[in-house]
């Protein structure tokens, strides 16, 4: 009868007798399992683990797919204020339905004034999500209707800004200098909303409290809100979408005359899918990369076990000769592999725990649900299961190789060292070839990403980020209720900033490059859009003169804005090159006219006075698109919408300073100027434009670093595999080498012979690796920029690198082979 503990004791004793082999195998596998477990922790926390809400599978987003735009195609489109109210009232597929939007506030009344991220939410949103507060309560429908000034804090805000005070309920705070009362604190796990694919850590929540303007007929075309609902039991997404479309048809029938051309189609997506939409490709690529590293580590382990089995051929032959069952030998081989793998798995779990804690700081800020990334029991279970499965399969090859041992031949050979057998050699060579192939796939991917990043750094941004410092301020509506008050503050601030030592140019804007963009609808005089009326969209920016000089945006035609472009002068606009080429191809845009709004809107015409270069509004790898600029001083006459304060947030502007002085010095000077004008006004997001551009490149940089790290690990493991097989081959062919030298072969010939064997393996592996790299092109394509997935330069360099490393891995065994003493080796024979 089989005694498993006897087998285990035997295996442990044999491993203790080979400490070098055991340590090498365990640590090599620990690296592979540790890396895989760490990445699985991220995938589990972000992709696999359910959202921290009640029955999250019933949660869906509801948004508009707007004809003629890409809204709602792959993400939840925005909705309008009137739609939120109508969908809540008229749809029947949802248990509950709520709306929300992000907001920024000046928080004061506790410590230093600060600009915070917040959210306006309908009270039903808390019901939809099914999360109760940790302390206190959430706001009610009555408070929402009565516009009660109450706030619910996030756990992080409660801890950081209120020191976790258990008596925080009832505390009065100021939001945009209006008094609010704290009525609740949400649990630590409550993180909502996450701006889809972007960093958005909400610090507090306030009632939506729609204003009259937000529910007026004019607001029917103001898309800025998001909606989330909980489906009724048994209701499918398709049924919910059909229900919402019936309501949308009624909404469109009630559109005002100037909005009759709009067509909306409500779309419903699972909330879980949307939360991780933009991170899914990245995490999938990470998981594939780490799986490749684990595969190489497993191949190396299998190779080491195979070498160990070959060296134990005489022992195995003796045991088989005295009647040991073949199944028992196979079982012990597999058990030995499993023991090594479990030991590697336990060490790998420790490495993964360290990697998860350390790696959180390296993860891109665009990754949602970072707080959910932990090494929990499910992840530990995954690691141990992975270790057992890895050990089982890695033990099969040496186990079956041992069973094929020729008992008579092995016993006749006695203790002599000779060839390990063609079959065994081919199996070891196959493992190394596969290692080289997958390493080359990763190395090629790394090279393509590095080349893409290099290409992106060479892109003409359309502006000069060097020596530019930016900052944001937001004027609260209570103190700055009119455009005249806003203009006065902006003018005084700009005058003082321009007087600072070292300032070469100073301007202001509602948006800066490399931070994203918004869109607005407009009409170009004499232009008929082939897509139909009200389909022309562009990114608007309201600016204060000297913005272009401060940002370094070149003027191509016409002129920049001046101080004379105020509310009493002709309405003017500056367009970018892409805008001019699209609407006036081959023409001079100067003197052309456009206006914001729709065809039937009564907004005034603006005259084009300048054309500037295309400034990259998103990351450098994003395509340029139409953009126009208008003076802040003319905002009320232009459209009355862009930089106007609302009941909830003031006029938010970026300061843009070009100076030869160090950024730290400029930051202190800017803060002092703002504090002098308004001691309570916080200045936020103070950074250089170089930092802003670097942040926009962060996702691509992260991809490149991660894949390059895995590629390096894979190549090193493959080199180790080449070294081990060549070293063993040399050790098993000592007599052959001695005979060759005894018959007249030069030592240089022996070196070439050994090195050539390594290069042959590398050549076959590279052929397979290049084929694998071509097959992986589909996965890589979306991560590349102006680089072909089959870039010959990258593939040639990666192949040469693998050959060079293979040659280096073969060098030491080759030198050892050449240093064999023929007389001593033959005497041993």
Regions from the language model: what does each represent?
Residues 1-22, 271-276, 304-331, 335, ...:
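Alpha-helical transmembrane segments of integral membrane proteins
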Residues 5, 10, 36-167, 174-181, ...:
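Structured, solvent-exposed hinge/loop segments at the ends of secondary-structure elements
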Residues 19-46, 50, 296-299, 341-345, ...:
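Short, strongly hydrophobic transmembrane alpha-helices
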Residues 39-42, 302, 338-410, 451, ...:
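Small-residue-rich transmembrane alpha-helices
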Residues 43-59, 65-68, 191, 198-213, ...:
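Short juxtamembrane loops and helix-capping segments at transmembrane helix boundaries
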Residues 88, 183-192, 208-280, 492-506, ...:
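"Rare, low-scoring activations can occur
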Residues 276-293, 378-382, 697-714, 756, ...:
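N-terminal membrane-entry
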Residues 297-341, 720-762, 766, 813-816, ...:
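Interfacial "coupling" helices/loops that link adjacent transmembrane helices in transporter permeases
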């Amino acid at each position: 009868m089989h005694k498993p503990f006897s087998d285990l004791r035997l295996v442990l004793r044999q491993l203790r007798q080979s400490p070098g082999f055991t340590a090498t195998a365990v640590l090599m596998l620990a690296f592979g399992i540790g890396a895989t477990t760490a990445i699985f922790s991220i995938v589990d926390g972000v992709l696999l683990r359910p959202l921290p809400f009640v029955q999250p599978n019933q949660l869906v987003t509801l948004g508009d797919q707007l004809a003629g735009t890409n809204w709602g195609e792959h993400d939840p489109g925005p909705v309008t204020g009137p739609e939120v109210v109508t969908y809540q009232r008229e749809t029947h597929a949802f248990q509950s339905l709520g709306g929300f939007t992000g907001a920024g506030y000046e928080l004061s009344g506790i410590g230093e004034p600060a600009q915070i991220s917040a959210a306006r939410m309908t009270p039903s949103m808390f019901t939809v999500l099914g999360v109760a507060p940790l302390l206190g309560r959430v706001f009610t429908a009555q408070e929402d209707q009565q516009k009660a000034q109450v706030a619910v804090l996030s756990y992080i805000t409660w801890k950081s800004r209120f020191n976790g005070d258990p008596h925080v309920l009832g505390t009065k705070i100021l939001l945009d200098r209006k008094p609010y009362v704290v009525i609740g604190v949400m649990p630590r796990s409550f993180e909502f909303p996450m701006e889809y694919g972007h960093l958005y850590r909400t610090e507090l929540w306030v009632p939506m409290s729609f204003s009259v303007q937000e529910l007026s007929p004019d607001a029917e075309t103001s898309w800025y809100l998001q909606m989330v609902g909980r489906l009724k039991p048994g209701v499918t997404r398709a049924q919910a979408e059909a229900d919402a479309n019936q309501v949308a048809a009624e909404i469109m029938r009630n559109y005002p005359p100037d909005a009759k051309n709009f067509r909306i189609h409500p779309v419903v997506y699972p909330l879980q899918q949307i939360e991780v939409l933009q991170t899914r490709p990245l995490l999938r690529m990470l998981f594939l990369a780490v799986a490749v590293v684990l595969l190489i580590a497993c191949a190396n382990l299998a190779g080491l076990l195979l070498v160990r089995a070959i060296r134990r051929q005489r022992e195995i032959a003796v045991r088989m000769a005295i009647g040991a069952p073949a199944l028992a030998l196979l079982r012990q081989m597999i058990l030995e592999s499993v023991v090594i793998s479990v030991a590697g798995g336990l060490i790998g779990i420790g490495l993964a725990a360290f990697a998860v804690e350390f790696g959180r700081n390296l993860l891109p800020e665009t990754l949602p649900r970072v707080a959910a990334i932990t090494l929990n029991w499910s992840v530990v279970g995954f690691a141990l299961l992975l270790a057992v499965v890895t050990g089982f399969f890695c033990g099969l090859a040496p186990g079956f190789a041992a069973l094929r041992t020729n008992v008579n031949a092995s016993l006749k050979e006695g203790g002599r060292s000779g060839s390990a057998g063609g079959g065994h050699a081919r199996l070891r060579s196959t493992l190394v070839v596969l290692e080289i192939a997958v390493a080359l796939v990763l190395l090629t991917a790394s090279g393509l990403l590095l080349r893409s990043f290099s290409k992106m750094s060479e892109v003409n941004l359309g502006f000069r980020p060097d020596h530019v410092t930016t900052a944001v301020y937001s004027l609260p509506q209570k103190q700055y209720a009119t455009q005249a008050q806003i203009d006065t503050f902006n003018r005084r601030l700009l005058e003082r900033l321009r007087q600072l030592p070292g300032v070469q140019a100073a301007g202001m804007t509602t948006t800066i490059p490399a931070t994203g963009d918004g869109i607005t609808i407009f009409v170009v005089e004499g232009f008929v859009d082939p897509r139909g009326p009200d389909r022309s969209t562009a990114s608007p920016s309201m600016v204060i003169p000297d913005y272009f000089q401060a940002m370094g945006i070149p003027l191509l035609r016409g002129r920049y804005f001046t101080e004379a472009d105020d509310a009493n002068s002709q309405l003017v606009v500056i367009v970018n090159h892409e805008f001019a080429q699209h609407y006036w191809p081959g023409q001079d845009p100067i003197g052309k006219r456009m206006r914001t709004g729709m065809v039937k809107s009564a907004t005034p015409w603006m005259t084009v006075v300048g054309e500037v270069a295309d400034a990259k509004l998103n990351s450098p790898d994003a395509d340029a698109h139409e953009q126009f600029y208008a003076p802040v001083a003319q905002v009320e006459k232009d459209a009355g919408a862009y930089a106007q304060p609302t009941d909830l947030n003031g006029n938010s502007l970026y300061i843009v300073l070009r100076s030869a002085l160090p950024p730290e010095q400029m930051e202190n000077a800017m803060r002092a100027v703002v504090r002098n004008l308004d001691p309570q006004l916080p200045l936020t997001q103070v950074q250089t434009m170089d930092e802003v551009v670097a942040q926009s490149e962060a996702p691509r940089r992260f991809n490149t670093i991660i894949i390059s790290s895995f590629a390096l690990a894979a190549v090193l493991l493959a080199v180790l595999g080449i070294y081990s097989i060549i070293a063993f081959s040399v050790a098993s062919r000592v007599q052959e080498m001695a005979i060759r030298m005894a018959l007249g072969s030069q030592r240089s010939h022996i070196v070439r012979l050994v090195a050539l064997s390594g290069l042959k393996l590398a050549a076959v592996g590279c052929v397979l690796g290049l084929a694998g790299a071509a097959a992986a092109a589909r996965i890589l394509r979306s991560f590349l920029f102006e680089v072909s997935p089959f870039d010959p330069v990258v593939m040639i360099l990666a192949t040469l690198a693998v050959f060079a490393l293979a040659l280096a891995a073969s060098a030491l065994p080759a030198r050892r082979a050449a240093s064999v003493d023929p007389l001593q080796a033959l005497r041993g024979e």
